[in-house]
Structures are given as C-alpha cells and as structure tokens.
Curated annotation (Swiss-Prot):
Function noted in UniProt: Actin-binding protein that regulates actin polymerization, filopodia dynamics and increases the branching of proximal dendrites of developing neurons.
Gene this protein is translated from: ABITRAM
Annotated compartments: Nucleus speckle; Cell projection, Lamellipodium; Nucleus; Cell projection, Growth cone
Species lineage: Eukaryota, Metazoa, Chordata, Craniata, Vertebrata
InterPro entries cross-referenced by the UniProt entry: Abitram (IPR039169), GCV_H/Fam206 (IPR033753), Single_hybrid_motif (IPR011053)
UniProt name for this protein: Protein Abitram
Protein keywords: Actin-binding, Cell projection, Nucleus
Residue runs in coiled coils: none
GO molecular function: actin filament binding; actin monomer binding
Main location per the UniProt record: nucleus
Length: 173
C-alpha cells in the first residue's frame, strides 16, 4: 500500500522537512504528506547517511529489548494494533561503515502504519531512492491533529535556506 503511494511522492505528496533533529547538526528528515493524512518518513537530502562515501551496514527496527517496530501489526479501517508514536519516538537505528550510528525518529505523532522491510535486505535503497523505495516508515496522524502535524516543519524553500546558511557558515570558517 504505502510503498506504491511512496512511488508517486513527487506528484501526490507535499514535502516537509525537520532540520537538526534533537539538536544533531545535519540530521535532517523529510516527511511526505499525502492529502489523505498519511505521512511517509524519509531521510532529507542533507542527512549524513546520504552523503558520498557513506555505506550503510545495518538497519535495526529493534528499538529496545521490548519494542520492535517490525512487530507492528495493523488491521482494519481504524488501524487497530498500530504502535502509537510521539514526535521523538525512535523508528530505527542505522549504522554506517565508518562506525557512526544514527537514530531515525518519527517526528510525527500518530499510528505507525508500516515500516519499510525492503531496506533491511537492500540498505542501498535508503541512499539511492530515499523519497521512494527507500522510505523508512509510514505514519498516520490522528484526524484531529492532521492539520497541525506540519507545525514546526520547514517548507522546501525554508529548508533550502537552512542548507545555504550551513554552506555559508562552513565555507566561512
């Protein structure tokens, strides 16, 4: 379901960004919001994992000993059984060949509809097609929160300004 929807990302989704999640420089995320409220969580283009020379070695949806996002079982129209996520809920941990580990957060309140199991067997999808087949998870905000879900997120234009400021501050030093 969501994978097929994610494929039409550029056409049917509105793109929003969250920069420096949890105060970590450049750890930026992107949410693709569909008009039906569904939000697809992806890495933003400036995320360290998407930079040249990075190789993803593992992706782990096991958040804690008692919580695995892979155990999320959703059924029915009301999405019964879906794990509820807060803005700071971790979705997965991704390790790279340089020894760095990145925690990917939901940053959207709502029900976890699905995680992308395809990236477990093919982590390169995350880097090659981050906005389509390389998405991380699909979250459905509560109906009453669906309009406010983008508060605090950046438009593509605002995100470009953030990237320009970073570039200018790094080239100025």
């Amino acid at each position: 379901m969501a994978a097929a929807e994610a494929l039409g990302a550029a056409r049917y989704f509105t793109r929003w960004y969250k920069a420096d999640v949890k105060g970590r420089p450049c750890e930026d995320f992107c949410v693709l919001q569909h008009s039906n409220r569904i939000c697809v969580i992806t890495l933003a283009e400036a995320h360290p994992l998407l930079q040249p020379g990075k190789t993803i070695t593992s992706i782990n949806y096991q958040i804690s000993p008692n919580c695995s996002r892979l155990q999320n079982k959703v059924s029915g129209k009301s999405k019964r059984g879906a794990q509820f996520l807060t803005e700071l809920a971790p979705l997965c941990r991704i390790a790279s060949s340089d020894g760095e580990e990145y925690t990917i957060y939901s940053f959207i309140r709502g029900r976890l509809i699905e995680v992308n199991e395809n990236i477990l067997s093919n982590p390169a999808l995350l880097q090659e097609k981050p906005s389509t087949e390389g998405y991380i998870a699909v979250v459905l905000p509560k109906f009453e929160e669906s309009k406010s879900v983008t508060q605090g997120l950046l438009t593509p234009e605002e995100y470009k300004e953030v990237l320009l400021k970073r570039q200018n501050s790094s080239s100025g030093s």
